[in-house]
Amino acid sequence: MIGCHCHTDRSNIRLLDSTNSVKELLKTAVKMEYKGLAITDHEVLSAHLDAIRTVREMKKKGDMPEDFKLILGNEAYLVDSLEEVRDNYKSGVTKFPHFLMLAMDPKGHEQLRILSSQAWENSFYTGTMERVPTVKKDVEELLSKDPGHIIATTACLGSEVNIHLLKIKAFEETGDSQSIKQHKLKIHEFITWCIEVFGKDKFFIELQPALSEEQIYCNKKLIDIANGYDLQMIVTTDAHYLRPEDRAIHQAFLNAKDGEREVDSFYEACFVQNVDEIHERMDYIDKEVIDQAIKNTMLIGEMIEDYTIEHEPIIPKMELPNFKLRHLFKPAYDQYEYIKKMSESADEQDRYLLKLIEDGFEEKLKTSELTREAFHKILNRINVELGELWEISQKLNQSMSSYYITVREIINIIWDDECGGDSLVGAARGSAAGYLVNYLLDNTQINPMQYDLPHWRHIHKSRPDLPDIDIDTEGSKRQKILKALRERFGDKRVLQIATFGTEGSKSALQTACRGLGIDNDISQYLSGMIPFERGSNWPLKHCFYGDKETGRKPIKEFIREVEQYPNLKETALKIEGLTNKRSSHAAGVIIFNDEYTKSNAMMKTPKGAYITQFNMGDSEAMGSVKFDLLTIEALDKIRVTLDQLIENNEIEWQGSLKETYNKYIHPDVIEYEDDKLWEMAGNGEIMDLFQFSTEVGHQSVVKVKPKNLLEAAVTNSLMRLMSDGEEQPVDTYVKYKNNLNKWYEEMTRYGLSEKEIRVMERHLKDIYGVADTQEVVMQMVMDKDIANFDIKESNYLRKSIAKKKEDVLKEVEELFFKKGKEIGTSDNLLNYVWNVQFKRQFGYSFSLLHTLAYSIIALQELNLNYRYNPLYWNTACLTVNSGGIDTEDTKDNKKTAATNYGKVASAIGNIRQRGIKIDLPDINKADFGFRTDINNNSILFGLKGMNGIGDDVIHHIVLNRPYSDFNDFIERMFKSGIIKKGQVIQLIKGGCFDSFGNRQEIMKAFISLISEPKSKLTLSNLKMLIENNIVPSEFAQEVRFFRFKDYISKKVYKTLKSPKDKLFLLDDVSASFYNQHFSEDSVVDMLNGQLVISEKAFKKEYDNKMSNIKSWITTEEPLKKLNDCLLIKEWEKYADGSLGKWEMDSLSYYYNDHELSGVNFAKYDIADFYKLPAEPVKGKPYQWRGKTLYEYETTRIIGTVLDRDKNKHAITLLTPTGVVTVKQWSGSFSHYNKQISRSIGGGKKEVIEKSWYTRGTLLMFTGFRRGNNFIPKVYKDSIYNHTVCRIDFVDNEGSMSLTTKRAEI
């Protein structure tokens, strides 16, 4: 049997559907003794290449029979008319029938790609459901041109034929013969259409072995249809999970998206069933019929070719302009073989590349100033690089030149500020920086010969691969760049690359919790305990079982917490790694020579962006060549700075963006040497310095205090390396930089001879004896005095040491020592090189070409701060961090990035520490983003940086300016409905109206406006008066009567219609009060000894008793008191707290005093973090596992939470003296970070206590300082009992009201 209808987790990209990975599905098929399997995901082909590779690997390992047949298909949604289902959609009525198509050969697969791309082109939403219909007419037109390449089947209960059969079933029960006749006609039309389009021998009726009443009915009718039209039948299981034991996990996975979804019965039979299970489930049908249907699946297999959709890479070719090669290098042609070959090449792409090289040579290298020696050195480098291109082109049988020409064209489009991307382009990224040809073409901006960068890291004939030139751009211009590329090359030739999101460890645990009905607060708490290391969370397997290779131990606390919830562990482990969504790759773009369906297929992201159906690796394997257009915020910040400088006449616009950039900050024109420039870096003065803005980066650049570009690049590399010992590589570098003799002492300790030390000097002296990059490692092993590796071997070593896999490392280590000993290298030198210099890069290794290029971008930022007032740069950083720049700058579509409030708040805190003033946002002056005020040496806060305002409101505020006073603003903006109450309050809190008067008085005026005071009172307002303690004591009895009436009104026994009345049943307590204060006139009955009274009769007596208080209520006194109370409540709701609290709520920083500046620091032993020793002070010793350790002296700090990093378990705290990072261990962080709620029924819950790490929370931490971090810690015998306390209130004496424990339910 062949499973002709099976789903993988790629079916999950629109709606959670399947828990089958490709590999496990195929393994299960083999286990169930299938002879083949079809991949038929829901309108997506993405799993096909993965399946091809998996089958190949399994056959190679002997895990799958050689004759196992893989079939590639698609389950489409086949409709009669797009307009009908889209424009006339009716929920529950409009159907999108399922339909199965299987490709018989490569042509059939191309047809699937075309149809699937058309379906995605047709896509639209009905509510939150994304529809991707395939129109019958499109199928007809396509297959009529070249029929016979696709097999079709009727699919599942959701198919057109089964939809009509189930309608017939319903009408049979009601006896509606006319409707039955109509649906039979529809079935006939559908069947005959399928026969006409696909052919009778390529269209099959599909039966399925589900036990539902509907499936049994349809199966019987489908047999009749097959016999009536002389069609073949097949049996499929529509596998969405692997085996019955996976059913509960599949149910939990699907329910995680929609808890109300009924999935268990619907998918009851949707697993990989063996033949016996199929027979057992279909025992109501003749065995011979089922046997033949099973046999027919093999018939389908015989009709399908064995083929692959893989293809050699197809390099895009640009249409070239008319050009003439000037033969600038002709006098040296005979000396430089490959320059001559390119000049005489039959391929015009080669000749055009050489023409561009000639242009760049004259423009960039100032040929008139070159000596003969320098001239030939450059020509030799060009010749070597062209030689690599030429030889690889011969091996690939296509011109590599076209790749470089295409990259140049893309970069020109990106630079174009008139009809292109209007974006800066980064100096270089990665290995492309090592190629002189790239520099001459303007593909990079760095002359590699100036820095002795090796060309062979980019491409080399020993590894005939395509080059990979990554391009950095402004993040805010990405959509504009993509639009410009589509306009240049055509919509059908440009696609962004797809990426498929998977269930990581955190999301898998959270998904499992949702599916199993475990509260979200618990889910967040548990997932917060998963460690985060080197940019990613631990896999769940490592959390539960540990991992020997990485040295990770099981997390006992995590295991203990998870195991409290049945099936959570098993479900989460199974879900982890499953595909759950689609999106566009952050960088990858493919430019096709032909329409994309020739080698790929198109789909859309949920936001409508056009992307490939295959991920990057698969797309490349199918022949596509990708171009990585990456985005870095540094370029956005540089661009905003340049725009400000132009606006303030500090620099002049040069007619284009590129020419302006070239004049002022191109790497060829910036300052490299000035000591003051490097002091700014070493002192940590530059905000968000590229590559050094993280905590580690900032610490490293301050430690190293680089004096030149090379030292900055080394710092950039070494700060990423980690040592097993206490001294980290960057610390070793600093030590040797300050005293190079210590490096020589190290080499002497390892027994190196004078000659061997000279060898080390050759490679390491310029970088103070610390091998920092891949290139240094490769050059050392290629040294004839060390190991004499060739390029291929050194490249293998580079890749191997970066993986930190014991078996791979051992293999390359043996090769290194073997080759070294063969050429006579001493054990001492080999040991020193391997165990000291190389060891630092085990597990992680960085490239010099990348760090140097990126350090140049940092240097450009330094230049902007050095040459111009740093206010411009600081303002640009705040603007970009706040999302205050357009992310899509097209005529019809303006968007802005989300504000990173925590990052903005931290940056403002750090800026103010350096004495820079941040002015409050003035309603008539503040821009969308932050703005430099050079005259006042300050930065004006940008409206985008405010909490709770919103882009649209900001645009309206700016559009309607100026405002003459606060009332003018209210009349035109608030009363007109443009701006909401909460947004006005945020503007007031943030000081936007301070120019109009006192902030608190303006707030009072607005609160008075919105508090809606009562104009008069009646007895119906008595409850409100009582709640606010306004009723005088003289009316105490009336208050009791009111509460009595309120109480019995909830005890309705019976409602009478005629005469209209309600009867109240009094309990013992209320009956006693009634008998004491009211007459029997209202009593109408007794029920089991309890009084029953009439509401109508009671009300007369009640109103009479309430007459005095009723008169009082209508007087001025209670009205004034109640309105005063309402005003106070509105104030407490919206405007409680100090000005500092207002500013934190609105701006996330304190313009005035910190909320905690009045705390009695001495009373609570609170320290200024910045005056604490940088390293913890040792205190009392103690023994732990045979070692002597020390307690550290602890103290306290206080501050306001600005931000939290759930991965790094860190809190950004604004203390009264500056911003501090507090770092906790995962369990403690999760404990204080979790939200605590309780169920209140009806699927709802109320929050008992928010996370303590919510922005704006005031906290006190106990612990010690380590470097730039504060580490919470208390000891058993310490005077402090808690690492974290929440500060609830500070009184006038500086005493704090503290909460020391989390709330309990």
UniProtKB/Swiss-Prot annotation:
GO terms for biological process: DNA replication; viral DNA genome replication. Keywords: DNA replication, DNA-binding, DNA-directed DNA polymerase, Nucleotidyltransferase, Transferase, Viral DNA replication. GO terms for molecular function: 3'-5' exonuclease activity; DNA binding; DNA-directed DNA polymerase activity. It holds the Pfam family DNA_pol3_alpha. Its EC number is 2.7.7.7. It comes from the Viruses. It catalyses: DNA(n) + a 2'-deoxyribonucleoside 5'-triphosphate = DNA(n+1) + diphosphate. InterPro entries: DNA_pol3_alpha_NTPase_dom, DNA_pol3_alpha_thumb_dom, DNA_pol3_finger, DnaE2/DnaE/PolC, DNAPol_HHH, PHP_dom, Pol/His_phosphatase_N, Pol/histidinol_Pase-like. Belongs to the DNA polymerase type-C family. NCBIfam families: polc. Replicates viral genomic DNA. This is DNA-directed DNA polymerase.
